[in-house]
């Protein structure tokens, strides 16, 4: 009785062995879904024994400590569960490593494919851009050459135009001087003509006066001769 009292006091401080067993059984039931082969067979056998004994105790209505046998059984179940968990962990690690390896290979393949595609695309467009830039440089050189030619032609035309303006200015100056000389010569000629005309008129007047005087003298002489002749005829 004393021992049972001690056991009862121990149960009051911790969860009962039945509760521990129930938790272990529930945990085992959840983990058993992921196990395979002999591990599941061992756990299912031990679970069946524990379940059978628990049902006997429940049907008898006797609540007592399972003692060392149940404790050993639970420890065995715990060991089996640990082994199963360890095996599951190893399988999970292997699967994880395999998955990581496969994923790395896929990622590496995808990365390499993308890199090749990017490199191919870069090469293709780089060549196109290079060709376009070369053509652009050629066009720019041609444009600069044409611009230089046009500038040279413009400078030549400007120089020719300046020379033409100088020549035209000189010719215009010559024309102006010639016109002034012409006007001056015309004035002098008109003046000379006036002088000549005046001199001719004066000479003509002098000649007319002399001729008139001569005619008058001849007329007088003729009249005198006629009178003399008449007188002579009358006298003789």
UniProtKB/Swiss-Prot annotation:
GO BP terms: namely: cell division; meiotic cell cycle; sperm DNA condensation
Q: How is it modified after translation?
A: Phosphorylated.
Residues of the region (Interaction with DNA) are: 52-57, 88-91
Gene Ontology molecular function terms on file: DNA binding
Instruction: Specify where it is mainly localized.
Output: nucleus
Its subcellular locations are: Nucleus; Chromosome; Chromosome, Centromere
Q: Which GO cellular component terms are attached?
A: chromosome; chromosome, centromeric region; lateral element
Residue positions of the PTM Phosphoserine? 36, 38, 59
Quote the Pfam families the UniProt record gives: Cor1 (PF04803)
- Stretches the record annotates as Important for oligomerization and fiber formation: 69-74, 231-236
Which parts of this chain are annotated as the region Disordered? 1-42
Q: Where is this motif: Nuclear localization signal?
A: 88-91
Q: Which residues fall in a coiled-coil region?
A: 66-223
Report whether Methyltransferase shows up as a keyword of the record.
no
Q: Which UniProt keywords apply?
A: Cell cycle, Cell division, Centromere, Chromosome, Coiled coil, DNA-binding, Meiosis, Nucleus, Phosphoprotein
Q: What family does the database annotate?
A: Belongs to the XLR/SYCP3 family.
Q: Which PANTHER family match?
A: SYNAPTONEMAL COMPLEX PROTEIN 3 (PTHR19368:SF12), XLR/SCP3/FAM9 (PTHR19368)
* Entry remark concerning the domains of this protein: Composed of a long central coiled coil domain. The N-terminal and C-terminal regions interact with DNA.
Q: How does it assemble?
A: Component of the lateral elements of synaptonemal complexes. Homotetramer; the tetrameric helix bundles assemble end to end into long homopolimeric fibers that exhibit a transversal striation with a periodicity of about 20 nm (in vitro). Interacts with SYCP2. Forms a complex with EWSR1, PRDM9, REC8 and SYCP1; complex formation is dependent of phosphorylated form of REC8 and requires PRDM9 bound to hotspot DNA; EWSR1 joins PRDM9 with the chromosomal axis through REC8.
Please give the function described in this protein's UniProt entry.
Answer: Component of the synaptonemal complexes (SCS), formed between homologous chromosomes during meiotic prophase. Required for centromere pairing during meiosis in male germ cells. Required for normal meiosis during spermatogenesis and male fertility. Plays a lesser role in female fertility. Required for efficient phosphorylation of HORMAD1 and HORMAD2.
Q: Can you name this protein?
A: Synaptonemal complex protein 3
Tell me which species this is from: Macaca fascicularis
For this protein's source organism, the top of the classification is:
Eukaryota, Metazoa, Chordata, Craniata, Vertebrata
């Amino acid at each position: 009785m004393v021992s049972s009292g001690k056991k009862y006091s121990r149960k009051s401080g911790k969860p009962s062995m039945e509760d521990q067993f129930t938790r272990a059984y529930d945990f085992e039931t959840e983990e058993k879904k992921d196990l395979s082969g002999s591990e599941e067979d061992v756990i299912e056998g031990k679970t069946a024994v524990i379940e059978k004994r628990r049902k006997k105790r429940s049907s008898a209505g006797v609540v007592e400590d399972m003692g060392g046998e149940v404790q050993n059984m639970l420890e065995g179940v715990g060991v089996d569960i640990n082994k199963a968990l360890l095996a599951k962990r190893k399988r999970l690690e292997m699967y994880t490593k395999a998955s990581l390896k496969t994923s790395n290979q896929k990622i590496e393949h995808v990365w390499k494919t993308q890199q090749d595609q990017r490199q191919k695309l870069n090469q293709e467009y780089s060549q196109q851009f290079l060709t376009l830039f070369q053509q652009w440089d050629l066009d720019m050189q041609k444009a600069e050459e044409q611009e230089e030619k046009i500038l040279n032609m413009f400078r030549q035309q400007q120089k020719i135009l300046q020379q033409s303006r100088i020549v035209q200015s000189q010719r215009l100056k010559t024309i102006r001087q010639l016109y002034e000389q012409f006007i001056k010569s015309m004035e002098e000629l008109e003046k000379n003509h006036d002088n000549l005309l005046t001199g001719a008129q004066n000479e003509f007047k002098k000649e007319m006066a002399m001729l008139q005087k001569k005619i008058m003298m001849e007329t007088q002489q003729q009249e005198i001769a006629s009178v003399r002749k008449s007188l002579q005829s009358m006298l003789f």
